[in-house]
Amino acid sequence: MLTVPGLCWLCRMPLALSHWGICSVCARAVRQRVSLCPQCGLPAAHPSLPCGRCLQKPPPWQRLVSVSDYTPPLSLLVHQLKFTRRSEIAAALARLLLQEVLMARRSTGLQLPDRIVSVPLWSRRHWRRGFNQSDLLCQPLAHWLGCAWDSQTITRVRATATQHHLSARLRKRNLKNAFRLELPVQGLHMVIVDDVVTTGSTVAEIAQLLLRNGAATVQVWCLCRTL
């Protein structure tokens, strides 16, 4: 997807604020329109009550906030973020996520975090890519919300197989004991930020780690929640 300075990247109309990248009309258009469970982020009958899945077997986090399903046009921008390290794309996507967070706070009293954490990459993968796309989202979010962020709160201590083609059961096994907590989180309200949540195995492993070490609550914020 070509990004043109001064024009909305999606509709190509002039931007009132050129550094935003996405106009307000398109920002509203990319938002998820179906009713979603506030806990797992999957389709549900009521957007303010946990779904039947979460009542029977809740995930280890309390809330999940997402912008959209992993579909165009948002998926195209997420792909560019993941492989090009363009700060203007990161800021624009972080702003979309911020808008979802603030709307959830107004409508449901969403708890704002004391600290946000990114999903870490294995050190060798981080070195090859040169950056962590989750870090690029965390930086502006922490600044706008006035909360703490440290990219070293959680580290990935071993390499894991690529998750894309694994079943949910194999994903869970693949990630077991893959992360280590480096900073104390006792009593803190924590948020895990990622670009895409598919089965939730990665963020579930991190959420369990945070809760075992005394975090008061854990939320997941992501750009795309695969439905």
UniProtKB/Swiss-Prot annotation:
<dbReference type="InterPro" id="IPR029057">
    <property type="entry name" value="PRTase-like"/>
</dbReference>
<protein>
    <recommendedName>
        <fullName>DNA utilization protein YhgH</fullName>
    </recommendedName>
</protein>
<comment type="function">
    <text>Could be involved in gluconate metabolism.</text>
</comment>
<dbReference type="Pfam" id="PF00156">
    <property type="entry name" value="Pribosyltran"/>
</dbReference>
<dbReference type="InterPro" id="IPR051910">
    <property type="entry name" value="ComF/GntX_DNA_util-trans"/>
</dbReference>
<comment type="similarity">
    <text>Belongs to the ComF/GntX family.</text>
</comment>
<dbReference type="InterPro" id="IPR005222">
    <property type="entry name" value="Competence_ComF"/>
</dbReference>
<dbReference type="InterPro" id="IPR000836">
    <property type="entry name" value="PRibTrfase_dom"/>
</dbReference>
